[in-house]
């Protein structure tokens, strides 16, 4: 009896334990959620304001939140002076360009280790650790001075939180991949090319090789005007692709046009312009061909608000989108600085456009560059959205149209002058003589 009672009690206790365990909520930590005591919150509120600003611009907060949810992290934070005054201005502008977002992210992730390393845990011998960018940092001790790569730790254990730690370092750490990207852009190696040479031609009369035409100096503009190199018309097929040859045979215009269209989309506010260039027309293909042949272009890109003001009548005519876009493309390489200096010096400047023979009028207004005439004018307000030495994109706040040419007043031809032959008048003496002599006098007949 006692044994059966004990078995029943055991089964009842087991049932209650299982029920309670099932009813309890699942309190497993959700990765990616951080609290106010996190090292990321401390970084954003710390005196490392320049680094925190770069983290926000690089769109890395969500990535770092996921990393903190999985493991502790160690952040090597450069002091503000290292990012403000001690950094090469060209390198800083390179990092802040929208098209170089991946380089900026790699640079910042290079400063973060997926583990917690305090100053007492610093290795006495040189030891390398993998960073969040999959590169390696070497931690060393040099005469009681902690170092990470070649940078000195000036504020060890500056910020300590349960999920991570921040060490202050004297300068920015630059990974080799980012340095190589910067060097390629600075030397224009990724967009430069060897001028192609034509195949030798044989003179059919002498059966000898024709003398080659004089060589064009490197970097000189193409011999043909850009209007002769354009495709015949918007109603015809798109312009053909560049001739055979590798990336060293011509400028890679297709890649550069694709790059600047991606920049427009990432920049924001120019989706309509990108859609017209790629989907509504074949201008993206034609621009790539022109750049491949050595021409340079400056695009005045209206923003989405300006494009929304276009009426259906303005876009419904055959070839209207192409003509509108042609008027916004200047066959020169101009930046915001060069155009502003020109209008400051000369007052008004007229730039050629691909909509021949119409020109784009530019003048200074309110400390900026104003394009167009009267109510149809537009201001340059997003300067240098994309500049790579071959293509320059400047954002404007209106759609430009060429000034309508007033027809000259028709000059009516003057009525032909009818000359009236006046009757010859005889002199008084002849008249008197006729009266006296009568009609028998021969001159009087």
From Swiss-Prot:
It comes from Arabidopsis thaliana. This is Fasciclin-like arabinogalactan protein 16. Glycans are attached at residues 72, 279. Belongs to the fasciclin-like AGP family. Residues 1-23 form the signal peptide. The keyword Nuclease does not apply. Pfam families: Fasciclin. Gene3D superfamilies: FAS1 domain. May be a cell surface adhesion protein. GO terms for cellular component: extracellular region. It is found in: Secreted. It comes from the Eukaryota.
């Amino acid at each position: 009896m006692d044994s059966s009672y004990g078995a029943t009690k055991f089964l009842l206790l087991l049932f209650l334990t299982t029920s309670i365990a099932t009813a309890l909520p699942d309190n497993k930590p959700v990765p990616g959620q951080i609290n106010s005591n996190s090292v990321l919150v401390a970084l954003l509120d710390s005196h490392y304001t320049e680094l925190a600003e770069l983290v926000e611009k690089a769109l890395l907060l969500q990535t770092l939140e996921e990393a903190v949810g999985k493991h502790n992290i160690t952040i090597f934070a450069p002091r503000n002076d290292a990012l403000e005054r001690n950094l090469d201005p060209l390198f800083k502008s390179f990092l802040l360009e929208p098209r170089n977002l991946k380089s900026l992210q790699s640079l910042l992730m290079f400063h973060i280790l997926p583990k917690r390393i305090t100053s007492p845990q610093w290795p006495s011998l040189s030891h390398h650790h993998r960073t969040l960018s999959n590169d390696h940092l070497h931690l060393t001790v040099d005469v009681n001075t902690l170092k990470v790569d070649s940078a000195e730790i000036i504020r060890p254990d500056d910020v300590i939180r349960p999920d991570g730690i921040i060490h202050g370092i004297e300068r920015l750490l630059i990974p080799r991949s980012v340095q190589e990207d910067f060097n390629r852009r600075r030397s224009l190696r990724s967009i430069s090319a060897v001028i192609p040479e034509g195949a030798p031609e044989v003179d059919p009369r002498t059966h000898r090789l024709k003398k080659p035409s004089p060589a064009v100096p490197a970097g000189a503009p193409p011999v043909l005007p850009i209007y002769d190199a354009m495709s015949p018309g918007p109603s015809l097929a798109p312009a053909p692709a560049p001739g055979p040859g590798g990336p060293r045979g011509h400028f890679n215009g297709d890649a550069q046009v694709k790059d600047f269209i991606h920049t427009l989309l990432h920049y924001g506010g120019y989706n309509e312009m990108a859609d017209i260039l790629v989907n509504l027309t074949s201008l993206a293909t034609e621009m790539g061909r022109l750049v491949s042949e050595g021409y340079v272009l400056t695009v005045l890109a209206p923003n989405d608000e300006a494009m929304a003001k276009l009426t259906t009548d303005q876009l419904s005519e055959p070839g209207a989108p192409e003509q509108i876009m042609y008027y916004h493309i200047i066959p020169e390489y101009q930046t915001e600085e060069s155009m502003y200096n020109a209008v400051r010096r000369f007052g008004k400047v007229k730039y050629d456009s691909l909509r021949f023979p119409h020109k784009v009028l530019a003048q200074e207004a309110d400390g900026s560059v104003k394009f167009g005439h009267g109510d149809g004018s537009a201001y340059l307000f997003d300067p240098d959205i994309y500049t790579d030495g071959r293509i320059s994109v400047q954002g404007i706040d209106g759609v430009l149209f060429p000034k309508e040419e007033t027809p000259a007043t028709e000059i009516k031809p003057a009525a032909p002058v009818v000359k009236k032959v006046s009757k010859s008048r005889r002199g008084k003496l002849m008249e008197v003589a006729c009266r006296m002599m009568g009609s028998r006098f021969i001159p009087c007949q």
